[in-house]
Amino acid sequence: MRGMPQRPPFLGCVVASTLLAASTLILRAQAPSGPPAWAYGVAPAGSQPAGRAAGGGSGATPADDGLPKHLEGSTQAFTLAQVRDGFNVADWYPGDHPEAPAIVMKGRAPSVRACGFCHLANGKGRPENAGISGLPVAYFVQQIADFRNDARKSAETRKTNTALMTAIAKPMTDDEIKAAAEYFAAIPSTPWIRVVETATVPRTRIAGGMFVPLDGAETEPIGARIIEVPEHPDRTDLRDPRSGFVAYAPVGSIKRGEALVITGGGRTLACGTCHGADLKGLGPVPGLAGRSPSYQVRQLYDMKAGTRRGPWSDLMKAVVANLTDDDLVAIGAYLASK
């Protein structure tokens, strides 16, 4: 109505979340059944992992031979030791991103690793961590605060880089956090993951929290999992920020996830209420479209399990309360496909 004050979009999200919280007192919440190992990049409890590899699908982490490596389309050259230096990011494609602040490319030795080392200079990230390009500044700053305050922990204790992120965040200065937040917010989030529905997946090794296909053509049933692997393992091993990932998902999961995301499916709140109709964010609320399904599922599970807390995470408690593990798989597959 003309002359009436307009309610900020984020306030509508808070109201909707509060109403949903009330409804969960009536619906019986689904108790967590244990962290889904696949989402955390660890072997299922009691199983024997196939092995470890850094890339290419076989053997241990290759030793540095001292020879410069090259990537197609790049004029840069780096040795493996340089690629693996957490305080001097191997910037393969400097023209792909804005001028980066020191905290992104160099970090601050000895305790603050460069943001771009794990999350890449363009912020696209990898399945074992998070894509952070395009995140709203306020959201980014709050998440670092949550790490510093020990509010963001993993429900899967073997997910060691969650503790590493906490250790990195604690000594960061406010200026460093602001510089990183503004830098990554200025880089749009673009497609990085190809979702393929299938009944079988390549057999894999676990490499630093990421699945890497074994050499050969061995396959296994996908089960109730999403298996996210590098499109080009050798390039991923060189931390190529242009080489994306393929996410294998169970047949039918995208359509089922669409129903849950768009309508809530009687179990939850429609994601677009808070994250925008296009799922690309709304004000300070982050976008979900096209982001890693492994990351998104483990975050939803952490919120459900109560290990990821903080002022904005608390708004998600009622949203995830009634979601089953199969629901999480479907939601992760659909969001990644957008």
Task: Annotate each PLM feature.
Residues 30-113, 117, 152-270, 305-338:
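Flexible coil segments in periplasmic/lumen-exposed cytochrome c-class electron-transfer proteins
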Residues 25-29:
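Sec/Tat signal peptide C-region and signal peptidase I cleavage site
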Residues 121, 277:
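Cys/His-rich metal-chelating microdomains
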Residues 1-12:
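N-terminal secretory signal peptides that target proteins for export/translocation
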Residues 12-24:
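Bacterial N-terminal signal peptides
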Residues 273:
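Acidic, glycine-rich low-complexity segments
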Residues 133-162, 289-300, 305-313:
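Extended intrinsically disordered, low-complexity coil regions enriched in Ser, Thr, Gly, Ala
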Residues 126-132, 283-289:
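Short cysteine/histidine-rich zinc-coordinating motifs and their immediately flanking basic loops
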